[in-house]
Structures are given as C-alpha cells and as structure tokens.
C-alpha cells in the first residue's frame, strides 16, 4: 500500500494591487525598454518599437510578470473579438436583408452592407434579389443566424448590444487581472485545474448549453421555417423555453419531460436527437437534430474529461506522471522533463497550441463543404468557397507560427545542460538524418509530381493525347482514395447500422441533394487529375515542413555556425568577414517557410475552386439533368500545366477583369491594387540594404542643402526588416489578388 502525503491545500493565488494604474506610460513610447524609451536617434527606432512592444520576454525576465502580461493581453484580444462580432450582428440588424433572405433563401442573396453614394460608388450595390440592392456577403453569418433560430432584425440588435457589453467586460477583466488582482505564477502553472475547468467548463458546459439552445429554440423555429411559416408568425424563443406544450406539438415526447431520461428510456428522445447522417433535403445542410445530438454527446465526453485530473482531492491523473511514464522502446527517457518545459517556457506551450489549432482549422475547412452544417449554406457557392479559402489560409499561418515559436523556444529557453536522452534531445541528436531524408523525399516528390505534368504538357503539345496520363489514356487512378470513399459510402449498412446515410455525400453511394434547382452536394468522383494534383499537395507540404523543421532543429547550432544560439532568434549573417552565412537564423527559416506555405495553400484552394465548379456545383433541370458551372472540364484540363493556366486562371479571371462598370467592379480594382501590393514586395525582396542607404544619403544631402534636414537620422531598413516588409506585402498582395479573383468569379456565375 502506498501512503501518499496529503495534497497541499489551495493557497492565495493572487497578488492585490501589484501595479498601479497610470496613463503616464502611454505618453512614453517604448517605456518597456531602456534603449527605446530614450527616444529616436535614427528612423530605426520606430521599427524597434513595433518589433519589441509585444515581445514580453524582452521587457523582463520575471516569468510571473510575463505570464500576467500575456493573460491580460488575452482579455484584450477577446474584447476585440466581441467588438468585431457586435459589428457583424449590427450590420445584420441595420443594413441587411436578413428577414427577406429568411423568407426565400434560394432566390435572394445575403447582403449586409449598403454603400453610400458619394462619388458614384453606389454602383457596387448589386441586385441580390427581392428588390434589395447591396453588397453580397460571403461570411455565412445569415446561415448561422438561421440555424440558431434568429428570426428578426430586433434579435440581431439585442445580440449586438450584448456583444458590446461583453467587449467592455473583457477590457475591464484585462485591467483588473493585471492591476487589481494579478494571478501568481503558481496559478498559471496549475495545469490540472486548468484542464478540468477548460474541459468541463468551456467545452463541456459550452457544448451542453448549445445543445440545450438547439433543442429548445433552434429546432422548433427551423421546423416552422422549413414548413414555410412566415418568420413573424413563429413564436419567440422564450415562448418555446417557457411553454412545454408548444414544443410537444412538434415533438410529442416533450410532453413526458425528463421522465424518459431518469427511467433510462432514452429512445423516446430520438425525435429530436437523431442519428441520420447525410443532408436535410429541404435546406441542404446537416440535419439540425443530428447536430443537437452531436453536441449533447460531445458535452458528456468533455464533462467526464473535465473530472479526470488530480487537484486537491488526491484522485485522478497528474500530467507530470503521465508524461514521465511515456517511454517507448526506442525513446530513451521519453517525455521526462517535458512537464517543466511546458509549464515554465510559454513559447513551447504556444508552439504546441498553434500546431494543434492550425491543423484543426484546416480540418474545419474540409468539413465545411463536405458536411455543410448550416441551412442553405451548401447552395451559397460564394460563401462555401470563401469559408474554405479562409480556413485554409488561417490554418497555414497558424502552423508556420507553431514553427516560429518552437524556434524561439529553442533559442531563448532550451537548456541543453539538463536535457539528456529525452525525446527532444534524441531528435536533436539525429537531426541530420531527419533533415536529409526529408530533403530526399522533397526532391523525389517534386521531380515526380511535376514530371507527370511536364510529360502531359509535352505529349499534348506534340498532339499525342493517347500517350498522356489521363482518365481516357494512361490511367493513374487514386485507388486508395477511392477505396476510402467506398468504405465510407457502405458504412451505414455495415459499420454504422443505425445511420440512414453516410457522414458525407461526397463519399459516394447516395443520391445528390439539390435545393431550389441548385446542387448542394453530390458524390465527388476522383480520377487521374486528382491523383496528379494531390502529389503536388504532398510536395508543397513536405517542402514547407522541411524548411520549418530545419529552422527549429538547427536553431541553436549547426555545422556551419556552431554558436548560433548566441546570435539570437533573428540575425542577418554571422558577422562581417564570414561569407556564406546569411539567411541561416531561425527567423529566416520562418520567413522562407511562409513563401512555401503560401505556395501550398494556393494550390489547395485552386484545386478546390476548380474541382467544385467542374464536378459538384451547378444547376439541375426538372428532368434531373445536372449542368455543372464549368461542365466537368477538370478531369481533362487540369492534367497539364497549360490547362491550369488557360482553363482555370485565364478563363475564370474573365469575370474579375471585365467587372468594370458593374456591381463587381470593386473586385476589379482590388485585383489590380493587390497585384500592385504584391509587386511592391519584390522591391524589398530583391534589393540590398546598401543600395537604399546610398540613395538615402544623397536625399539627406539635398535636405541639408535646403536646411530642412530632420533631427532624426533616416536609415535604410535593416536586412531583416526589409525581408519582413517584403514577405508581408507578398502575402497580403497574393491573398487579396486571389480573394478578388475568386469572389468576382463565383458571385457572377454561382
């Protein structure tokens, strides 16, 4: 029998009034740094001010103070999110056609922005149907509002005001928990309590309350809406909540209340907690009863998970014990020491969270179209394309951020003296093998995937279609993907016998679902064209990983620069007199990784956009004949590079290029402007610092001549600053160009 020492009781976990509130520091730019606070000598000062303002590590080495600043900043972030949400709901209430859309979502487009006529820009107010003129929105808010049971613009107003109140509350909390009652370091490090509260509270009770809202408010209101009842005739949410008879008319088992729950006769509830699979044929979205059931189930899981970790009661798991027990046959000490890393070095913790959240965001992108969760979302092609693109970009940025903070952790926080033979140490010791193998994989994937396209272009150019890789000549069918599709399509009858349809129509087997003459979703065929582009995906993803992982594993030292850790996270080169050591800092790997991330995500969203227009989206005639937007040309056109240029980029750019004089003209201007921003980046990326310094000095000479020289000396951007400005404009220009291209196209044809 093991006698454990009693767990320590909870101590006082906050400091009262640690830092007095004062606005004086607001008037002192750079108050957090002795150097910057002195004020500007040269124009470099303003760059340093921005670079270090939120780099709390550089303000102090006191971990408790850093933790408090981060914690407080999180409340500020939440405040901004609530403010943004409030603005979205306010636009829905004040400037939108939400009530009209609700009454006829198949013929009326969603709009929540009306442009004021000042210099003729009211041309942007296009006709979205129902006699309303405004800018068509593609955020999916209307669909979410309908799914949650919002039936009037008054309800949107109330929610907007509520969000503003919450924004103010968050601002107050940020001030309060830094200036009035600041948590002690021990509170931030109490991971078991944190897990219990976040799992049971945020995820468990959050899901449970959403499930409750769905059952008591969303489901009945959506039942009425689907039956064509006028939104103004539908009872208000509180009437459903307070009056059980109203619900019992729609779902008879409601009359029995909680009795079936306590008598374990749960199947009584299967009217509104279903397990159907597939899509609701009326709205083209997942069955809302399936969604309510899902949230209830998730809530139970997380409520249980939120009681798993050991706090004051001496029962449950301890994270440190779990990690230290985690040893495999080939992993030495395993995760020993990881607990200390993750509870004291926040960059490591952040890196992990960014990697998980980034991956999750990309998973969301893929589920939003394959299992469209909201009513009338699947037939709103512009919104579908926007949601996919948005979540892919966000996921890409978060994953690069994960590598960035992993590298910062390696440079600033990793202590090699007390890490021996644990997992991280073992990875670092065979990093050469990892990176060289990964490099080989990248070369293999690059040559072979691109080589297949080049072969096809060559055969096509020589007029030999019979020798091309295509569905009609030499087939390269994606047999594994087709097998997975088939397995899922057959699941309802076999591995998931309770389901009536498979999780997603895209797997195959089922019929297509059309709403209002438009295809919502249908089985997606995969062929040679998909096989080719999937290998490009594999190539770009592996190269991104190669660059980012090399940056992390060689952040502290390399054969070229053994003392790299002393040079810091970002540095241009290893000092004067040592050639060939530029672009080796951990920061430079993030910089280079961003370009490949952009590359990878671009191919993904191009693939998605074209594939959906070619093989999924389109109209259906009364005879049941489907006409796709681009007539199924993906399979034959996307198998050559020339096809991508001619039939995707050029052919589909016609809408944005010809948008002048129409309500889509703003996209035409953005398309042009964003190209300019992108080109502007090349000026920073292709020229060196000396060129600009030389130019600046001659400009300063002219100012001196006229006696108008400023006191602050102008300086050229440092090498790192120039690269940062370059990559920012490159990504901003590239993403905005793609945005204008996609939206002008899909709003015009979708």
From Swiss-Prot:
Pfam families per record: PsaA_PsaB
Record-listed chlorophyll a' binding positions: 675
UniProt-annotated binding residues for [4Fe-4S] cluster: 573, 582
Record membrane topology: Multi-pass membrane protein
SUPFAM superfamilies for the chain: Photosystem I subunits PsaA/PsaB (SSF81558)
Enzyme class, first EC level, given as a word: oxidoreductase
Family matches, as NCBIfam families: psaA (TIGR01335)
Name listed for the protein in its UniProt record: Photosystem I P700 chlorophyll a apoprotein A1
């Amino acid at each position: 029998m093991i006698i454990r020492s009693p767990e320590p009781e909870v101590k006082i976990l906050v400091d009262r009034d640690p830092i007095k509130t004062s606005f004086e520091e607001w008037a002192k730019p750079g108050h957090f740094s002795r150097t910057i606070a002195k004020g500007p000598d040269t124009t470099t000062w303003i760059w340093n001010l921005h670079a270090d303002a939120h780099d709390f590590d550089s303000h102090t080495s006191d971990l408790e103070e850093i933790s408090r600043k981060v914690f407080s900043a999180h409340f500020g972030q939440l405040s901004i999110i609530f403010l943004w949400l409030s603005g979205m709901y306010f636009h829905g209430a004040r400037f939108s056609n939400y009530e009209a859309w609700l009454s006829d979502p198949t013929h009326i487009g969603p709009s929540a922005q009306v442009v004021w006529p000042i210099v003729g820009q009211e041309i942007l107010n296009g006709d979205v149907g129902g006699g309303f003129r405004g800018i068509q929105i593609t955020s999916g808010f209307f669909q979410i509002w309908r799914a949650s049971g919002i039936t009037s613009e008054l309800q949107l107003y109330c929610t907007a005001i509520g969000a503003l109140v919450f924004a103010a509350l968050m601002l107050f909390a940020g001030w309060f928990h830094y200036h009035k009652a600041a948590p002690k370091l021990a509170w931030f490090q109490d991971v078991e309590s944190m897990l219990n509260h976040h799992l049971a509270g945020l995820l468990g009770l959050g899901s449970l309350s959403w499930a409750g809202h769905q059952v008591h408010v969303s489901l009945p209101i959506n039942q009425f809406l689907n039956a064509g009842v006028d939104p103004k005739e539908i009872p208000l949410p509180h009437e459903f909540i307070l009056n059980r008879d109203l619900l019992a008319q729609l779902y008879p088992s409601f009359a029995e209340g909680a009795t079936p729950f306590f008598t374990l006769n749960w199947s009584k509830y299967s009217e509104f907690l279903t397990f159907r699979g597939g899509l609701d044929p009326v709205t083209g979205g997942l069955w809302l009863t399936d969604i309510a059931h899902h949230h209830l189930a998730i809530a139970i899981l997380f409520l249980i998970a939120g009681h798993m970790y050991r706090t004051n009661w001496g029962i449950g798991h301890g994270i440190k014990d779990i990690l230290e027990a985690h040893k495999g046959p080939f992993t030495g000490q395993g995760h020993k020491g990881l607990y200390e890393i993750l509870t004291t070095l926040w960059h490591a913790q952040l890196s992990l969270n960014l990697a998980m959240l980034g991956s999750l965001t990309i998973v969301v992108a893929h589920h939003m179209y394959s299992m469209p969760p909201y009513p009338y979302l699947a037939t709103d092609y512009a919104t579908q394309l926007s949601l996919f693109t948005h979540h892919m970009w966000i996921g890409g940025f978060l994953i690069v951020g994960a590598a960035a903070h992993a590298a910062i952790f390696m440079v600033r926080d990793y202590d090699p003296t007390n890490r021996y033979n644990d997992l991280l140490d073992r990875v670092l010791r065979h990093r050469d093998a990892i990176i060289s193998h990964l490099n080989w994989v990248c070369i293999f994937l690059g040559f072979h995937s691109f080589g297949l396209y080049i072969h096809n272009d060559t055969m096509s150019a020589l007029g030999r279609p019979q020798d091309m890789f295509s569905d009609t000549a030499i087939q390269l069918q994606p047999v594994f993907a087709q097998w997975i599709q088939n397995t899922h399509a057959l699941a309802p009858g076999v591995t998931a016998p309770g389901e009536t349809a498979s999780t997603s129509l895209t797997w195959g087997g089922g019929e297509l679902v059309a709403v209002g003459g438009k295809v919502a979703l249908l089985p997606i065929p995969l062929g040679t064209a998909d096989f080719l582009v999937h290998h490009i995906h594999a190539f770009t993803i592996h190269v991104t990983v190669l660059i980012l992982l090399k940056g992390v594993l060689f952040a502290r030292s390399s054969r070229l620069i053994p003392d790299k850790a002393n040079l810091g996270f970002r540095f241009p080169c290893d000092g004067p007199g040592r050639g060939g050591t530029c672009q080796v800092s951990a920061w430079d790997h993030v910089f280079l990784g961003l370009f490949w991330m952009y590359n990878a995500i671009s191919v993904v969203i191009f693939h998605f956009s074209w594939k959906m227009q070619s093989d999924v989206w389109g109209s259906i005639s009364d005879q049941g004949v489907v006409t796709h937007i681009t007539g199924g040309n993906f399979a034959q056109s996307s198998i050559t590079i020339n096809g991508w240029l001619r039939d995707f980029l050029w052919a589909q750019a016609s809408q944005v290029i010809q948008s002048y004089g129409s309500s889509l003209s703003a996209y035409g201007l953005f398309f042009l402007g964003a190209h300019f921003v992108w080109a502007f980046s090349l000026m920073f990326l292709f020229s060196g610092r000396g060129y600009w310094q030389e130019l600046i000095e001659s400009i300063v000479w002219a100012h001196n001549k006229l006696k108008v020289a400023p006191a602050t000396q102008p300086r050229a951007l440092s090498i790192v600053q120039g690269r940062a400005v370059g990559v920012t404009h490159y990504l901003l220009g590239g993403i905005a160009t793609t945005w204008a291209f996609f939206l002008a196209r899909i709003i015009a044809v979708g």
